[in-house]
Every structure is written in C-alpha cells, then in structure tokens.
C-alpha cells in the first residue's frame, strides 16, 4: 500500500482514491520520512476505510501520532456533511472525551523541587487512581443525570472550582445536546462511583516546569514563562464512556443494515447523522463528554487543595488558573469551508485535538488573537508541548492536530521488555518521581512504548497545523 502513497507537501502524504474502489476522498497523513517508514500498513487501510463512508468531506485524515485503533485509527479525523453524512462510535472511541487540561501556578521549579515528594504524595492521596478506582464523592442517580447534562457547570455549582474556569474549557465544558435519558442504566451504574477518579492505563497527573519558550507573545497571552510550574491532567469518561460506546456500537450495526450503508469494516458501524439512531448516539456521546469534563474539574479541585496543603497558600494566591482543556476523543458539530462554501459538518476526532486558528468565535476572548491553545502531552520521561491552532489547520485538517506521542509498543510488548522497577529507577535518575497504583502500569507506560514526542511536535509545527508555544518537562508523575 505504501507504494501508492505520495508526498504532496511538507510532512504531508496522500493515499489516492484509486487505492480502494469505495473511497470517496483521498487520505492525507501528516508524517516525516521516519514515521512514514515505520507506520503499520493496517493504519493506511483504516484511513482508506474511513474515506469510504457516506458524506465524508475533503479528506480522511491522520495526525502524526497515528496508530492502529478500533474502526478509525488513533489520530484519525474525518468530517461528514450534516445532511448526507454519518456518525460512527468507532470515530470517537471508547474513552469518550479523553482529554487534557493544563493548569498554571505562580511557583517556579526551585519552589517546588524541595517539596516535590510531599506534593506528589498529597496528590496521590487526594485523587483516586488505578484500574476500577472510585471517586471520593458519592452522587445519586438523579445527580448523575445533572452531571451528564451540565458537565463542568454542575461541578462549579457544587463548589468544585471557580466560575472563571469555564471559559478556558473547550465547549465551556458542556455539550448542549446531551440527553441523559439516552444513556443506559448500566452506563450510569458504572459512572456513579467513578466520578472524580483518574483511572488507569495512559491516564496521568503530571507536575511539569516550562523548559523552553518558542513564541513570546503567545506564551505571555497563555500565561506561561520559563521555569514556571504547571499541572497536566489526562483522563476521560471512565467506565461510563466505555459503556456508552459499547451500547451504541451494537445499536449502530443494526442501523447500518437498516439504512443500507456498505461498511468496509464492521468496526465502522454508523448511522446517518440526522437519523433517529445517529441523533441518539450523538446525544448520549455528549453526556459522556460532559461527564469527562466534570471528572477533570473535580480532579483539578483536589489538586488545588493538595497544593494549598503543601505550600500553605490558597489556590487563588498560587494563581492556579486553567490555561485550557481540550477533548481528543469526540464528535462535534462545526462549520468549515469546503470548496469555498461554509458547511455544517460533524467532525470526528479520535486521538486528535481541536486546533482552531486566530479569530475563531469559539476561542476564549483573551486568546482569540493567537489561536486556540493546543496541549500535546508526551510520556512519563519526555517533554509535553503547549501549541496553538492555525488558519492552516482550518484549511487542511478541519481545525485538528495531534493529541500526544502515540504508542509505538503494545502494552503486552512493553510488559515483556521492561519491569516497573526498572522504569521507575531510570526516571528517578533523570530527576522524575513517579507514583502509581501498580508497577505494571509503570512498565506498560514506559517512555520506550511511545513515539518521539519531539518528532510529533515538529511535524505539527513544520506542516503548520499547530505552532509551538512552550515545551514543558516532567518533574513528577501520578499514574493510574
């Protein structure tokens, strides 16, 4: 298949429509030569399969951190016409609104280093983590409906945060289309005890410091400066989101047959966006997204309390404001230019970050001249990046960019090659403290299991789909 792929621009490759009879649009992939050579053939197959779905616009896209996934590849992006297109749970994923939040402080690396172990211990104690972890709060079935409907607004009303937090969250932390009646009792049952917990796998809380500034104006606008300590939170909708996806995958398989949609892969089960089935999934998925935003909000609150406890200063005085919060597993109703015409589309981003350019109405007013903040986390031993969206992303990728480093090794392979103790000791030698619910998670999430984040960030920057603002390096990590 790679023999049919051509390089069409800087760090951009294209899979032609001639590759597969059913392809309606070409597939564009953002890679450099090294990642192109190493990318699995089956990822190209998944990109081609998505290009076969009804109503797809312009391109089937894959970001630099792409790898094999369920239905869409991880790192896959596709926009579908709101009238003729489809919506697919395989284009969102099981962890609905898995996403990343960046919180700033007015502390420096030197302020935090002497108290880092105490701080990590306090965070580890205050934020439940690990497989099957349960949150510290207990909510009723009626209350979970409020969470699913209101998202971050519910958390702020319950005094888990500040009113001003809301403006620096994608969608203001609330998908308005959410309808809790379309979420199964089983999904709610899974979500009830887990609200306010980190979960396991690649989810993490990380204490970082700003190592390098690339764009002084953007950094000043976003409120970051050299040696400043920031917090990164990476988690999603826990078991509730997983159950919503599982419930609707079965539902969508029947819908695809009902509407005579020819699927190149049954994992791409879908329904017309405006059908009863399509609308039900979109509204249930919106509930999962709202749960995830509320989840990150509760965790933010407990991290603020952890800092207050260790530094004997209020979170307000520590200036612990949210820089931004982005979703990277979601489907969104957006407007984009397609062949010079402004169209209503539903953009699927699965392991991809929204990256709206300067001037867009949905960007917070204090950031509108720069572009939307984009947060691209690395792994436990490497840097993370704060970037911003661009007009080029609006033109080429429906305002989308990468979401992280992307896996290079499966969890099973990582466990065979490394032990948790080895990884923990190696990180400690680099001055990075790690706390986790299990040593197995540390091994599974070792730095070697991921692609080079520097490479991914460079491709995004060089191709112009997002631009570097700052580079952060880890000081301490809490893993699920």
UniProtKB/Swiss-Prot annotation:
Q: How is the cofactor bound?
A: Binds 2 manganese ions per subunit.
The EC number on file is 6.5.1.8
List the molecular function annotations (GO) for this entry: GTP binding; metal ion binding; RNA ligase (ATP) activity; RNA ligase (GTP) activity
Its required cofactor(s), as named, are: Mn(2+)
Q: Where does Mn(2+) 1 bind?
A: 95, 98, 203
This protein's record includes keyword Transit peptide: no
Q: Which positions make up the signal peptide?
A: none
State the Gene Ontology BP annotations: tRNA processing
Major enzyme class: ligase
| Chain sites annotated for binding Mn(2+) 2 | 98, 234, 328
Query: Is the keyword RNA-binding assigned to this protein?
Result: no
* Alphabetical list of Gene3D superfamilies matching this protein: tRNA-splicing ligase RtcB (3.90.1860.10)
Keywords carried by this UniProt record:
GTP-binding, Ligase, Manganese, Metal-binding, Nucleotide-binding, tRNA processing
Q: Which residues form the active site?
A: 403 (gmp-histidine intermediate)
Catalytic activity, as annotated = a 3'-end 3'-phospho-ribonucleotide-RNA + a 5'-end dephospho-ribonucleoside-RNA + GTP = a ribonucleotidyl-ribonucleotide-RNA + GMP + diphosphate; a 3'-end 2',3'-cyclophospho-ribonucleotide-RNA + a 5'-end dephospho-ribonucleoside-RNA + GTP + H2O = a ribonucleotidyl-ribonucleotide-RNA + GMP + diphosphate + H(+)
**Residues bound to GMP:** 202-206, 328-329, 377-380, 384, 403-406, 479
An example Pfam family from this entry, by short name, is RtcB
The family note in this entry says: Belongs to the RtcB family.
Fill in the subunit field for this protein: Monomer.
Q: What job does the chain carry out?
A: Essential for tRNA splicing and maturation. Acts by directly joining spliced tRNA halves to mature-sized tRNAs. Joins RNA with 2',3'-cyclic-phosphate or 3'-phosphate ends to RNA with 5'-hydroxy ends.
Further remark: Ligation proceeds through 3 nucleotidyl transfer steps, with 2',3'-cyclic phosphate termini being hydrolyzed to 3'-P termini in a step that precedes 3'-P activation with GMP. In the first nucleotidyl transfer step, RtcB reacts with GTP to form a covalent RtcB-histidine-GMP intermediate with release of PPi; in the second step, the GMP moiety is transferred to the RNA 3'-P; in the third step, the 5'-OH from the opposite RNA strand attacks the activated 3'-P to form a 3',5'-phosphodiester bond and release GMP.
The protein in question is named tRNA-splicing ligase RtcB
What is the taxonomic lineage of the source species? Archaea, Methanobacteriati, Methanobacteriota, Methanomada group, Methanococci
């Amino acid at each position: 298949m790679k023999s049919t792929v051509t390089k069409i621009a800087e760090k951009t490759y294209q899979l032609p429509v001639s590759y597969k009879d059913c392809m309606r649009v070409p597939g564009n992939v953002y890679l450099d030569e090294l990642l192109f050579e190493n990318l699995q053939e089956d990822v190209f197959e998944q990109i081609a399969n998505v290009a076969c779905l009804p109503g797809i616009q312009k391109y089937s896209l894959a970001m630099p951190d792409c790898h094999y996934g369920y239905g869409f590849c991880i790192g896959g992006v596709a926009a579908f016409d709101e009238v003729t297109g489809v919506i697919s749970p395989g284009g969102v994923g099981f962890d609905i609104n898995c996403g990343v939040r960046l919180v700033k402080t007015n502390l420096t690396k030197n302020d935090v280093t002497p108290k880092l172990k105490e701080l990590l211990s306090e965070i580890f104690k205050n934020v439940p983590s690990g497989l099957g972890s349960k949150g510290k709060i207990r909510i009723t079935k009626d209350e979970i409906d409020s969470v699913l409907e209101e998202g971050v607004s519910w958390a702020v009303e319950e005094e888990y945060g500040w009113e001003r937090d809301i403006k620096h969250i994608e969608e203001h932390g609330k998908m308005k289309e959410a309808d809790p009646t379309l979420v199964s009792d089983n999904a709610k049952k899974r979500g009830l005890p887990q609200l306010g917990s980190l979960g396991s796998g690649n989810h993490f809380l990380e204490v970082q410091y700003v190592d390098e500034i690339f764009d002084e104006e953007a950094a000043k606008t976003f409120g970051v400066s050299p040696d400043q300590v920031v917090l990164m939170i990476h988690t999603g909708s826990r078991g509730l989101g997983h159950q919503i996806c599982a419930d609707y995958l079965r539902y969508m398989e029947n819908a695809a047959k009902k509407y005579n949609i020819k699927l190149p892969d049954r994992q791409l089960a879908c329904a017309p966006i405006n059908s009863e089935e399509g609308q039900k999934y979109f509204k249930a998925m919106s509930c999962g997204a709202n749960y995830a935003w509320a989840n990150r909000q509760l965790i933010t609150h407990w991290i603020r309390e952890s800092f207050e406890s260790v530094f004997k200063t209020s979170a307000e005085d520590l200036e612990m404001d949210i820089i931004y919060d982005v979703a990277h597993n979601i489907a969104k109703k957006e407007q984009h230019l397609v062949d010079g015409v402004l169209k209503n589309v539903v953009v699927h981003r699965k392991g991809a970050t929204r990256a709206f350019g300067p001037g867009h109405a949905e960007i917070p007013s204090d950031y509108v001249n720069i572009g939307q903040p984009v947060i691209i986390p690395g792994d436990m031993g490497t840097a993370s990046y704060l970037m911003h969206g661009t007009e080029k992303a609006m033109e080429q990728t429906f305002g989308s960019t990468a979401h992280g480093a992307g896996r290079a090794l499966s969890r099973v392979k990582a466990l065979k090659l490394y032990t948790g103790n080895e990884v923990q000791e190696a990180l400690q030698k680099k001055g990075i403290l790690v706390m986790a619910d299990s040593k197995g998670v540390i091994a599974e999430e070792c730095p070697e299991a991921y692609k080079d984040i520097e490479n991914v960030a460079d491709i995004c920057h060089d191709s112009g789909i997002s631009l570097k603002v700052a580079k952060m390096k880890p000081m301490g990590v809490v893993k699920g």
